Swiss-Prot record:
InterPro entries assigned to the protein according to its UniProt record, in alphabetical order: NAC-dom, NAC_dom_sf
PANTHER family xrefs: LOW QUALITY PROTEIN: NAC DOMAIN-CONTAINING PROTEIN 90-LIKE (PTHR31744:SF220), PROTEIN CUP-SHAPED COTYLEDON 2-RELATED (PTHR31744)
NAC domain span: 5-162
Database matches in SUPFAM superfamilies: NAC domain
UniProt name for this protein: NAC domain-containing protein 90
Domain comment as written in the entry: The NAC domain includes a DNA-binding domain and a dimerization domain.
Keywords on record: DNA-binding, Nucleus, Transcription, Transcription regulation
Species whose genome carries this gene: Arabidopsis thaliana (Mouse-ear cress)
Length: 235
């Protein structure tokens, strides 16, 4: 009975909720079976993307668009090596620019990186429709006046399939989206610089080092921040 899915259940977390609640509780050892029935612990890089929907959280297994996982740090990474992003049929490769995740009060709470799955061997693999957002939380034990550090014990990964239409992640109930837009429009951010440094990062990648300069501008009357990424190094 405990594993039965509630009729009508939909999991539509915001990025802030993923980092500040779900990932934070997992890192602090406060997660339980009920949370893991939604977001299980799994090294997604050891599983073929097409198999991930079958091993997703019991309460989200019927979702045809997106799946969430807590991914533990690999042993090779803990020993100072680069984590593997290769499966039997292909590999995950970072794409685009990594970026910060902010809370509603404009506090940096984590970082997000996007990856795409390619079949075959690097660097000549064939791009697929499988994508992933990987989230890391900021280490809150570090003095706030110092350069933010990312915690590595676990990351939270959202795996999804690109369909050409708006992503499921952006199709939360209208009430939720309207509230977020109102909150976003109320935030006025002055020019800010921050840097995120941590130990080794991956994806067929090397060490992570983000140096970001952020400007808030308004374009076409929309209260959306535009980001100027400078000296960014996160392969």
């Amino acid at each position: 009975m405990a594993d039965e899915v509630t009729i009508g259940f939909r999991f539509y977390p915001t990025e802030e909720e993923l980092v500040s609640f779900y990932l934070r509780n997992q890192l602090e050892g406060r997660s339980d079976d009920s949370m893991h029935r939604v977001i299980p612990v799994l090294d997604v890089f050891e599983v073929e993307p097409s198999h991930l929907p079958n091993v997703a959280g019991v309460r989200c297994r019927g979702d045809a668009e997106q799946w969430f996982f807590f991914v533990p740090r690999q042993e090779r990474e803990a020993r100072g090596g680069r984590p593997s992003r290769t499966t039997g049929s292909g590999y995950w490769k970072a794409t685009g620019s990594p970026g910060p995740v902010f809370s509603k009060d404009n506090k940096m709470i984590g970082a997000k990186k996007t990856m795409v799955f390619y079949t075959g061997k690097a660097p000549t693999g064939r791009k697929t429709k499988w994508k992933m957002n990987e989230y890391h939380a900021v280490d809150e034990t570090v003095n706030a006046s110092t350069i933010p550090k990312l915690r590595r014990e676990f990351s939270l990964c959202r795996v999804y399939i690109t369909t050409g239409s708006s992503r499921a992640f952006d199709r939360r109930p209208e009430g939720v989206l309207q509230t977020e837009r109102m909150l976003t429009s109320d935030v006025a951010v002055a020019e800010t610089s921050f840097r995120v440094e941590s130990s080794l990062e991956t994806s067929i990648s090397g060490g992570e080092h983000i140096d970001v300069s952020m400007n808030t501008e308004f374009v076409d009357g929309l209260s959306e921040p535009m980001w100027d990424w400078e000296q960014l190094t996160w392969p």
